[in-house]
Amino acid sequence: MVFDTETEKGKRIWALSQFLVKKNILDHNELHQLNNRIELVYLENDRENALFLVALTLKKPLTIDIWNALYEGFQDAEGAELRITFQEDATFFKDGSTKSSVTLAIIKDYFKSFFGKDKKYRILLEQELTHPNFLSYSNHELKANCQSQELDQWLIEQRQAFIKWMHQAGFTHFGFVSLFNPPAEKQLKVKSMKVSKYDKQFETEVFSTEFVPIHKINQQMDEIKLMGQIFELKDFPGYNNLRNTLNIYVTDFQLGGSLILKWFYKDPKTIEGIKIGTWVKATVKVERDAKTQLLQGIIKEISPIETPAYYRRPDQDKQKRVELVFHTKMSAFDGINSVQEYAQFAKERDWKTIAVTDKDNIHIYPTLYEVAKKYGLKAIYGLECNLIDDHIKIVSNPDKTKLKDATFVIFDIETTGLHGRYDSVIEFAGIKVKHNREVERMQFFLKIDGPLPAAVTEITKITQAQLEDGMEQQAGLEKLRAWLDGCVMVAHNGLSFDLPFLQTQFEKYNIAPLTNPLIDTLALSWALNPGFASHTLSNICAKLKFDFDDERLHRADYDTQALKKVFDYFKEQVELMGITNLEQLDQELNQQCHFELLKRTFTNTGIIYIKSQSGFAKLYELLSIALTDNNATRPLVLTSTLQKFAKSFVITDNPVQGDIFKAALTKPLKELEAAIKRVDFVLIAPPGAYAGYTIREGLKKEAIPNAIKLVVDTAQRLNKLVAVASDAYFIHPWENEYYKAIVCAKGLGGRWHRHFNYKEREQRVPNVFVRTTGEMLNEMSFLGEQLAYELVVENTNKLAKQLTADDLVPVQTKLQPPVIEGSNENLAAKTWSQAKAIYGDPLPKLIEQRIQEELKAIIDNGFGIIYWISHLLVKQSVQDGYFVGPRGSIGSSLVANLIGISEINPLVPHYLCESCQYFEVNEEVDDGYDLMVRDCPKCGAKAAFKGDGHNIPFATFMGFAGDKIPDIDLNFSSEYQAKAHAYVRELFGEQYTFRAGTIATVAEKTAYGYARNYFEIIKQTELATAPEIERFKQKLVGIKRTTGQHPGGIMIFPNHKSVYEFTPCGYPADDTSSDWKTTHFEYDALGNTILKLDILGQDDPTMLKHLGDLTHVNPQNIPRFDKKLTEMFWSVNPLKLKPHYLDEPTGAIGIPEFGTKFVRKILEQTKPKGFGDLIRVSGLSHGKNVWADNAQKILKDQNLSLKDVIACRDDIMLYLIHKGMQAKDAFEIMEKVRKGIALNAKEVQLMQSNGVEQHWINSCLKISYLFPKAHAAAYVLMAWRIAWFKLYHPLSYYACLLSFKLKEHDVSGFKSGVSFVKQKLEELNTLYRIKRIKPKEAELLTSYEVYLEMMARGIKLEQISLTHSHATRFVEHNGMLIAPFITIPGMGEAVANSIIEARNEKPFSSLDDFKKRTKITKKHIEAFTQMQLLDEFREQDNQKKLF
């Protein structure tokens, strides 16, 4: 606005303008805050009148000095005009301040002639202020608006003048963005994102004129230059000598700022410098992808560049601050970064210490220790937790006043806000009651300074006019104080809001505080009505059937009347419980309803830090108690528990959500002092971290720094050290968008994040990134330079020194197994006795030597207990009638085989006579199961000379020195697994046995959904391109959702120690009804310390048990040598199929580990000749980079056999030793290859010097992972036994296969015949080939393959029978299979079992009888009808009608 300096208002403005341009008015370190300004820029399509924009975005706020220098610079150029504009309703104060926004502008107009017309060209440098003493952080833009793009060259010339002025002003880094309007065919409207006025946007790096921000790229652009960071690479190989395509995903971290760049290349060397995390600049042609219709950039030129300055965020201060509050991805739905990212950030800024304070968990401790050690950092171990008093107040200041004699004042207040120190009471209403009779009412309004906020009027319907007729604050507060005195107060949420608000107001006006009792009806409702989902006054009235008008809600007089009805009802209820006075009311309800009160009560967010090594066990116990005994909808740390362990910790409140800061806003000074005295030191945060209070709770912005100062002043007066923390949930300011996405995601149990406003569908996120030292000093400079430095730098370093004085190690590293007396002796005795029972006495030297070596390694290294426990478990399972399946790498151990925990004999191939124990090594085969059964050459016993031994070195299981902790997997029947778990607990005791805990995190598909949901909530779906969603998805993956448990892992802790010396414990998914507790740390963190048993439940052992039961054949007696069975793995000939039924060359369908399409292809190509070859196929199929482009190519190109390629890790060691290499060298090469670690030149040369073939060496160099031979042998043994039943007992085999292995069925489809099943199979195979098949369809595909094979073998499958079907299993009946009830669509086990139970009681007499005695539904009846299963009932009903 133009102002007249002769008017009074004009004079004030002019005086203010002079103040602003004076030099050195502001302190040099004073920083400035800003409102956000959202601008719409319209680019017209008229060429002559086109708008041209040059924008300069500054990286830091402008001080008065800089404004003055710029002003002088413009004047030096050609003269300039200084303007200051105010809003019309600006309010001025004596100190010259204003509550309105102020715009400071330096303006220079030029006139140039174009197209024969004079056009105005304006330079405008402007900044919006919220207060004369505070200048803005954002929107520092130098704008040049002109009428035509012909001005381009002239503007470039002017750029030099701009640069001169900016240098004069002290800026060294800045640039320009040139935006031209698009072609005239379309009118383009450039929209800025709509954001809340409170939503602080991070400042973006300045782009020079050559680069276009990615989110502004559109189809009208042709060739552009951009820059960004690579966050994903996808390489697509070209075929038939065509070029390869590399999709490079880049982002500049602005919302919508991700793009796929396509690079076509032939030579792989050209892409060597293109790596994830690299910043690049590129010249690209903009076009739409023909398939996805997404904008993409076709690369013409690309090169790496340095990370732009803004994104480097260096910490240049000599003395660094220490960040004390940081939340990682392990804070459920509340952290964005991994601890690795955090440590790298710290290391790059030369920080020495990092702290982690995740919420309600310390999962990160083991990783934090390892990462800190890797980066050379010290670690501070913290826990953010919910602190709560043991006693939940229902009554404040309770005494023995009898309920029947008390005078109650039921009251309510309406206020301008939630914060007693910064808001005011505007209405009071109360009803005084004695002996159940109303004796007096009071209601009045109170005046306030300034206008009544519109939001308050909207909620309460109270108007400014009503307040103007009200009482002055002092008088009104004194009046209500006097009226309340001597009475028992009653208020809803009175203990948390009404009472502290009034007490704070009394303190403000020097009025004596209230000391009389107050009953909080909110807490009373929690205790009396545990079934209520909500305890708002309106909801309680609705539940109790009291009239309540929501339109009149939030008026003190109306709320009070409603509350009186509620309180009268509650009083009757407690009197019926025998409660007669206030003290009883408070004490007895706490005792009777303690858990319900804990569930609902508001908690204090505290932070506990470990200060010594002994503190870990104390913290682990404290957290365990919170996660188990005191887990009331969230883990709670009770005051009594904290006091018990307090000496081991350093304790404080969270700087933002803790009671200290809340007290500074809402409570009297006395309560603030009490909160501060309770902690060891005080944490505060920078103002940006408190934005939640201004956004969610309507707190005035100026209250934040005032409250911070109050906390600091009070703490220092009480001699408490004060430090500043970011209270960070992500590292960089631009990661705010990821945090918003997780804030918008609904958490477990349907809970919304505290920063998400569900009603408005809006996230309201504070600026909670990790500040560098300079950033934090700037933001805290309102405290003054010296005090800010003390709190930000000096005190954080003091605390860090205290908290890292010890060399803290959160997890133990030495194996500490449980103790069973005599376990080592029993193991040795069992091993020797069993060996002699099998191989005779004396033992063959080979066997005796192997046992001695193994037992020495096992017992000397403390592993005997592991073997013995496993032996006891398997023995118990076998005694209970359940076969235990083959078990992993343990098969490398002969001791394990002899004591019964492994069926894999690792000796060299050999013969053994079952009659005379004659032992003979055979070197003609490489697997003992490939030795034909013979008559014994010594005693002549018929068919007693049988082969065994799979030639597996012990070193592959327990290391060359035998000191590697054995990982024993026990595959029990899924029907027996729970009993096996219970047996372990019985052996060692509940306090020493826990399920291995796991952490369930956000998976890729879930992260994708969260990202899409975020863009929908902010109504910016046009920005949700595939690469942008990919960027968000990558950041959201891995965030903790909840905890879980390993499917079979049982952790056994030493019975002479406490579990808390190793880990906290909890319940899976915080389910306190769970039968098992879990370890808080995952197995990987405890694997070198605590014994873990993998007691897995699998369908294969279950299937074998039932096959044995059906056929009366013991699976362990199945022949080891069977050429027909071997052939069935790769040929259908042994199955004697009907022709033209099945387009499948192998007989492996349905055989575990061999039935997949991938393995069947390997079988088809390799045609294994025996058991040893089947082990190789298993190794090839389970390894990584072992078959495709490796063994497959070698077999094809060099005409070799399976025994000539590397299939399992043991092959390497055995072959290299065979070639003459030292065993230790062979072992070390095997270890590197099986882990995918590249061999060095020396190791390759060593192999070459020992005559190892080049194709064999090349194969080693390609391998990423190799399967252990013992594991492969175990898989093959299980497959072999099941395959034997398939060949010789087909009906029983298919009954068990369909019952236990196939998850999806189409019995009607089977009945429809071969053509139908073939058609369905072809449809699903097509989906499989194009990778569009869904999980359920994939299951059906396997089922249809089995159906066709059954048909080809002449096996019939009949529909469900009401008289013969089982609930869940396919059963044999009259030479065919009968389907179970569970195959009916939509029928679960409970309903199916109800039919069996009812049928076992007596036959069904009618349809009504069938419905009445089972749990079937209308839909089930419809399904039964369609399958004609109810026809017999209709016949029965018709016969009844005849008679």
Curated annotation (Swiss-Prot):
It is found in: Cytoplasm. GO terms for biological process: DNA-templated DNA replication. GO terms for molecular function: 3'-5' exonuclease activity; DNA binding; DNA-directed DNA polymerase activity. Its EC number is 2.7.7.7. Keywords: Cytoplasm, DNA replication, DNA-directed DNA polymerase, Exonuclease, Hydrolase, Nuclease, Nucleotidyltransferase, Transferase. GO terms for cellular component: cytoplasm. Residues 408-567 form the Exonuclease domain. It holds the Pfam family RNase_T. SUPFAM superfamilies: AF1531-like, Ribonuclease H-like. Its main location: cytoplasm. It comes from the Bacteria. InterPro entries: DNA_pol3_alpha_NTPase_dom, DNA_pol3_finger, DnaE2/DnaE/PolC, DNAPol_HHH, DnaQ, Exonuclease_RNaseT/DNA_pol3, NA-bd_OB-fold, PHP_dom. Gene3D superfamilies: 1.10.150.870, 3.30.1900.20, Metal-dependent hydrolases (3.20.20.140), Nucleic acid-binding proteins (2.40.50.140), PolC, middle finger domain (1.10.150.700), Ribonuclease H-like superfamily/Ribonuclease H (3.30.420.10). Coiled coil: none annotated. The keyword Iron does not apply. It catalyses: DNA(n) + a 2'-deoxyribonucleoside 5'-triphosphate = DNA(n+1) + diphosphate. Belongs to the DNA polymerase type-C family. PolC subfamily. Required for replicative DNA synthesis. This DNA polymerase also exhibits 3' to 5' exonuclease activity. NCBIfam families: dnaq, polC_Gram_pos, PRK00448.1. This is DNA polymerase III PolC-type.
